[in-house]
Amino acid sequence: MPSITGKTKLLGVIGYPVGHSLSPVMHNAALQAMASDYAYVAFPIAPEDLTIAIAGLGASGVQGLSVTIPHKQVVMPLLTQITETARQVGAVNTLWRDGHGWQGTNTDVEGFLAPLLELKQDWSGRTAVILGYGGAARAVVVGLTQLGCPEIIVVGRSQEKLAQFANSWTDPKIKQALQVLPWEALSTVIPKASLLINSTPVGMAPHPKQSPLDQSLVEKLPPTAIAYDLIYTPRPTRFLQHAQERGLVTIDGAEMLVQQGAAALKIWLQQEVPVDVMRQALLHHLEKSA
């Protein structure tokens, strides 16, 4: 680990709690590989302290911040500017200083898209099905719209929350592509899904043997479909295990986590960053913790 001096610049993550965050693992590995005189640390900021903390971190010369739960939405009014992507998602996960205050964006969209873009597929005429309607699903919907996916189906168990999700969008392209359907519709929509995304927490600890879908539903996916789970531990999740048994292409949340972090680090440092180093550091940490 490089030594910290009086000239070392600070980056960090704010959340509450924040001790579980894997961002310091990835970012410090990259900073060390780049021989950059930066350090990335975790700042546990209680909700009632957010306003004073944002001002204080800025006044202290902190260069950039990752934002995690519970601050991703409530921090937005404290910023001088947010990107259109963050506005669409309704949340920020990355902040940087602009001389007047903090600006914000949402790199979850870029993180979600990166492994799909690697596949170099044409998404026009494709159908994507998203399980769940939380904050992660919002980033996925924005990403799929940027990808050019013309049919985006969000499936959930609460009709009220589905209606709220559908009515929360103002972008005409998103409104045109988006449908919301009850969970019971899955058996009808899964056979036409080119991409099936789990944005729910089902399958995470403390219930790693659970899956959001019965295996019988996974078996209804077309043989060319892609299964994408935003969960990154366990690896693979039960949902992705079932998809792998079908011989489907699978993507897990670890790559999204790496890519959203790399996108943030590029903003802060204004240069290319070693994504492979970040990926290796994260996967090594996950293997040790398994």
From Swiss-Prot:
Reaction(s) the record says it catalyses:
shikimate + NADP(+) = 3-dehydroshikimate + NADPH + H(+)
Pathway the protein acts in = Metabolic intermediate biosynthesis; chorismate biosynthesis; chorismate from D-erythrose 4-phosphate and phosphoenolpyruvate: step 4/7
Entries under InterPro entries matching the protein: Aminoacid_DH-like_N_sf, NAD(P)-bd_dom_sf, SDH_C, Shikimate_DH, Shikimate_DH-bd_N, Shikimate_DH_fam, Shikm_DH/Glu-tRNA_Rdtase
Matching Pfam families: SDH_C, Shikimate_DH, Shikimate_dh_N
Please tell me where shikimate binds in this chain.
Answer: 21-23, 68, 93, 108, 232
EC number from the UniProt entry: 1.1.1.25
Q: Does the keyword Oxidoreductase apply?
A: yes
Lineage: superkingdom: Bacteria
Q: Which GO terms describe its cellular component?
A: cytosol
Q: Which top EC class is named for this enzyme in its record?
A: oxidoreductase
Which SUPFAM superfamilies does the record match to this protein? Answer: Aminoacid dehydrogenase-like, N-terminal domain (SSF53223), NAD(P)-binding Rossmann-fold domains (SSF51735)
Q: Where does NADP(+) bind?
A: 84, 132-136, 230, 253
State the active site: 72
Subunit-structure text: Homodimer.
| Function per UniProt | Involved in the biosynthesis of the chorismate, which leads to the biosynthesis of aromatic amino acids. Catalyzes the reversible NADPH linked reduction of 3-dehydroshikimate (DHSA) to yield shikimate (SA).
Q: What is this protein called?
A: Shikimate dehydrogenase (NADP(+))
**Protein source organism:** Synechocystis sp. (strain ATCC 27184 / PCC 6803 / Kazusa)
